[in-house]
């Protein structure tokens, strides 16, 4: 790929497609909120402006994708397949912790081959809402977590703005504000915001369009 001058036809063909991104998940009493931006890039080209990076692993378990788009989706697909079999064997929905362990094991096994970071979040009858980070094959439960290239811009904001005991609507607002701030500063994040709220009652999907995003001082 040329480093100077105007890009030529086909100059992006050898660039790996990345969900250079901002992903986030937050626990609340009775469920979780998972959110992401929607931009996918290959080199300096934006190849998809509205890609949904929130992938279902089971009925009430989702993962948020970042890293190489193909690698992240491959991990999600493998995990979803294993969890489907696991649920059939148990004759009940798998636990969120089990889903996180599946993702962790796949990520660690193929750590030399796959470039991806997945956040696993969901609800089950045993522990309620849960959020797990799985970067590099680790597994840690957190009240909230962020990931992707845009996350480096918002650590200070999320640390200051998070408070225990938030309502679902407060969690959605917290997630929307954080991802919007990251999108304003990270060239690899952008587009719309996808939000998924998972509770015992089911899964609620929302899309925050560009003209509906909150506005901040720098704009």
Swiss-Prot record:
CDD domains membership: proteasome_beta_type_6 (cd03762)
Active site: 21
Propiece residue ranges: 1-20
Catalysed reaction, written as an equation: Cleavage of peptide bonds with very broad specificity
Enzyme superclass (EC): hydrolase
Reported modifications of this chain: Autocleaved. The resulting N-terminal Thr residue of the mature subunit is responsible for the nucleophile proteolytic activity.
Record's keyword annotation contains Protease: yes
UniProt keyword terms in alphabetical order: Acetylation, Cytoplasm, Hydrolase, Immunity, Nucleus, Protease, Proteasome, Threonine protease, Zymogen
Entry EC no(s): 3.4.25.1
Induction conditions: Up-regulated by interferon gamma (at protein level).
Pfam families: Proteasome
Subunit structure: The 26S proteasome consists of a 20S proteasome core and two 19S regulatory subunits. The 20S proteasome core is composed of 28 subunits that are arranged in four stacked rings, resulting in a barrel-shaped structure. The two end rings are each formed by seven alpha subunits, and the two central rings are each formed by seven beta subunits. The catalytic chamber with the active sites is on the inside of the barrel. Component of the immunoproteasome, where it displaces the equivalent housekeeping subunit PSMB6.
PANTHER family according to UniProt: METALLOPROTEASE TLDD (PTHR32194), PROTEASOME SUBUNIT BETA (PTHR32194:SF12)
Protein name, UniProt field: Proteasome subunit beta type-9
Lineage, broadest ranks: Eukaryota, Metazoa, Chordata, Craniata, Vertebrata
């Amino acid at each position: 790929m040329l480093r100077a001058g105007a890009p030529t036809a086909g100059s992006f063909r050898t660039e790996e497609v990345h969900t250079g991104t901002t992903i986030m998940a937050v626990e609340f009493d009775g469920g979780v909120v998972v959110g992401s931006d929607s931009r996918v890039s290959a080199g300096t080209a934006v190849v998809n402006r509205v890609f949904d990076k929130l992938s279902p692993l089971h009925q009430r378990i989702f993962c948020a994708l970042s890293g190489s788009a193909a690698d992240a989706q491959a991990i999600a697909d493998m995990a979803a397949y294993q969890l489907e079999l696991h649920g059939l064997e148990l004759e009940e929905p798998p636990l969120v912790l089990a889903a996180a362990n599946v993702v962790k094991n796949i990520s660690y096994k193929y750590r030399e081959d796959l470039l991806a970071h997945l956040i696993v979040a969901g609800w089950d009858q045993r522990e309620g809402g849960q959020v797990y980070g799985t970067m590099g094959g680790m597994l840690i439960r957190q009240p909230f977590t962020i990931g992707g290239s845009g996350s480096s811009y918002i650590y200070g904001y999320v640390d200051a703005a998070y408070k225990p005991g938030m309502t679902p609507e407060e969690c959605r607002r917290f997630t929307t504000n954080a991802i919007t701030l990251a999108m304003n500063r990270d060239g690899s994040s952008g587009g719309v915001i996808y939000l998924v709220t998972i509770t015992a009652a089911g899964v609620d999907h929302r899309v925050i369009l560009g003209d509906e995003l909150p506005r901040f001082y720098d704009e």
